[in-house]
Regions:
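Charge-dense, helix-prone N-terminal extensions
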Residues: 1-112
Length: 112
């Protein structure tokens, strides 16, 4: 999956917004809470939040590491898009979205 495919997938999720942070990172957010971050410059790099179980499983795969500064919150960083299939990318980014959604106020959740 490339940056454009990630962007297309994320923007189809309800109430997703995008913005550029830290100069060159494209952030996908739900109610101002990030759930996926991709680098706009340099080599491919994408990070997303995952469950404790998925974090342990994914970080055992070569090419997937705990995300710098965000690992304590169970974010992973991927530098080679081919380590996951397109279906896996969509599954894990979708799960990241759901994890963020579950932490938002119930009123917001019900509005979706």
């Amino acid at each position: 999956m490339n940056l454009e495919s990630i962007q297309t997938f994320c923007l189809q999720l309800p109430q997703t917004t995008e913005g550029i942070k830290w100069g060159n990172d494209l952030c996908f957010m739900l109610s101002e809470k990030m759930y996926c971050v991709a680098s706009l410059t340099g080599p491919f790099s994408c990070s997303f939040k995952c469950s404790d179980e998925d974090f342990a499983k994914l970080t055992e795969i070569p090419g997937i590491i705990p995300a710098p500064y965000m690992a304590r919150n169970k974010w992973v960083n991927i530098h080679e898009s081919s380590v996951l299939t397109d279906e896996e990318w969509e599954h894990y980014i979708g799960n990241s979205y759901q994890l963020i959604l579950s932490k938002l106020p119930k009123k917001f959740q019900q509005s979706l």
